A protein has these predicted regions:
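Helix-turn-helix
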Residues: 8, 16-54
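Secondary-structure edge/capping motif, primarily at the C-terminal ends of alpha-helices
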Residues: 67-70, 98-105, 133, 160-168
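Hydrophobic alpha-helical connector segments
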Residues: 68-96
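Short, basic, alpha-helical segments at the C-terminal edge of helix-turn-helix-like DNA-binding modules
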Residues: 57-63
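Amphipathic alpha-helical packing segments from all-alpha helical-bundle domains
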Residues: 110-136, 144-158, 162, 178-186
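N-terminal positioning helix adjacent to the helix-turn-helix/winged-helix DNA-binding module
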Residues: 5, 9-12, 149
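Amphipathic alpha-helical segments used for helix-helix packing
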Residues: 91-113, 127-131
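C-terminal peripheral helix-coil segments that are non-catalytic and often amphipathic
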Residues: 128, 162, 166-204
Length: 204
């Protein structure tokens, strides 16, 4: 279990990375943000790579909890886009990982491994959900179309932030709702939901 100081270091690093980008923040910047000495920070983390590893672990734990079978079993077709909104909320907490993922993966091997692992986990979880919805006749999509829907969802989840950054849209909530709107526009017509449910989703 990480010490309170280590957790404070990770929380401060996460804030700075999200605000300024990982590349613009040094270990000294993180120490100054916390008003501790660089030596104190070094005692807990021997450089930025270990800090990044700690943040990857935090994010992995959050996503594993969200994507575990017991959680997925509770997600019904009418809940799907709310579920995606929660995934986006988790993602926005660690949005620096999606700003320049290729650069991060090149610098930090664990990030590259984590991105691949996350995509596989999302593919598996989303595939199971859509397959169940189709079996319940709550989704009109063939197996091939379901695979493409999974690809589309993951592409938006992993790439939309970069697109928004290029358009100077850096507000986390705006980025979240843009990604969610893209998915709803493309996928909602495939779902067989009650009109009241669809109306609520469009207003959310």
């Amino acid at each position: 279990m990480a010490s309170k100081t280590a957790e404070r270091i990770l929380a401060a690093a996460l804030t700075l990375f999200n605000e300024q980008g990982e590349n613009a923040v040094t270990s000294v910047d993180i120490a100054m943000e916390l008003d501790i000495s660089p030596g104190n920070l070094y005692y807990h983390f021997k450089g930025k790579e270990q800090i990044i590893d700690g943040l990857v672990h935090w994010y992995s734990e959050a996503m594993q909890t969200l994507l575990r079978p017991a959680t997925l079993e509770k997600v019904q077709a009418e809940d799907f886009f709310y579920f995606i909104a929660i995934v986006l909320d988790k993602q926005q907490l660690f949005r620096f990982m999606y700003r320049s993922p290729a650069d991060l993966a090149e610098k930090y091997p664990k990030v590259k491994h984590w991105h691949k692992q996350q995509i596989r986990q999302l593919e598996s979880s989303l595939t199971k959900l859509l397959l169940r919805f189709a079996a319940q006749e709550a989704l009109l999509a063939s197996s091939a179309e379901q695979r493409l829907m999974v690809d589309l969802i993951i592409m938006i989840l992993t790439q939309a932030n970069q697109y928004d950054d290029l358009r100077n849209i850096d507000d986390p909530q705006a980025q979240k709702f843009h990604a969610l709107s893209l998915m709803m526009t493309a996928l909602l017509p495939r779902f067989r939901l009650q009109e009241t449910t669809v109306a609520q989703l469009r207003k959310a």
